[in-house]
Amino acid sequence: MTSICSSKFQQQHYQLTNSNIFLLQHQHHHQTQQHQLIAPKIPLGTSQLQNMQQSQQSNVGPMLSSQKKKFNYNNMPYGEQLPSVARRNARERNRVKQVNNGFVNLRQHLPQTVVNSLSNGGRGSSKKLSKVDTLRIAVEYIRGLQDMLDDGTASSTRHIYNSADESSNDGSSYNDYNDSLDSSQQFLTGATQSAQSHSYHSASPTPSYSGSEISGGGYIKQELQEQDLKFDSFDSFSDEQPDDEELLDYISSWQEQ
């Protein structure tokens, strides 16, 4: 009985061992099939390694050369620029300079009180104005001046109209005008009379006397030795001189106007 049991046990153990071996073989066979599906890596030779190194060097070479060229270009002096580029840069610098000078002149013509009032205590009151703020304040300042001119013109026109209405109502301007005419006529009449009297005295005959003798010794004796009255003909004198005629003609023409 014991021999039979031992033989059965050995037989079962043998079967288990064979099955395990079969499974291990099957797994090994399956793994080898999977490895065969993947392409095996070809070992690299010396020629392939050299080709790879050359390709890497060729890729790195242009990068280094471009960096070197860029570095050298930055260090190039300005004299090596193209003439067209140099002229363009000079024109641009001149334009920027003119614009800056124009804004400086504009800031100088803006009163500081106007800048402080229009900037509302902002940047313009203490610091340098920007170009945008300068233009904005200049526009507001010009508008304010234009409004002042318009208001002044309108007020002066109203004042003229009001004064004309008042003078037409009270008649004072008319009286002043009459007074001025009367004074001018009186002046012209006096001038005419003086001119006529001057011409009459110039035409009248004038007597001539001889000189007197003065004797010494404390006694003064005047003797009229000769008294020759020389009369020129009245016809030889004209009533009016040429200058008087011109003056009278001018006065008469002025009165007729």
Swiss-Prot record:
Pfam families in alphabetical order: HLH (PF00010)
GO BP term, pick one: positive regulation of transcription by RNA polymerase II
UniProt keyword annotations, A-Z: Developmental protein, Differentiation, DNA-binding, Neurogenesis
SMART domains: HLH
UniProt note on tissues of expression: L(1)SC, SC and AC strongly label the presumptive stomatogastric nervous system, while ASE is more prominent in the presumptive procephalic lobe.
UniProt-listed Gene3D superfamilies: Helix-loop-helix DNA-binding domain (4.10.280.10)
Manganese recorded as keyword: no
Residue ranges of domain bHLH in the record: 83-145
Complex and partners: Efficient DNA binding requires dimerization with another bHLH protein.
Any further remark recorded for this protein: AS-C proteins are expressed first earlier in ectoderm and then in the internalized neuroblasts, while T8 is expressed in presumptive neural precursors, once they have segregated from the ectoderm.
UniProt function note: AS-C proteins are involved in the determination of the neuronal precursors in the peripheral nervous system and the central nervous system.
Name listed for the protein in its UniProt record: Achaete-scute complex protein T3
Gene (UniProt): l(1)sc
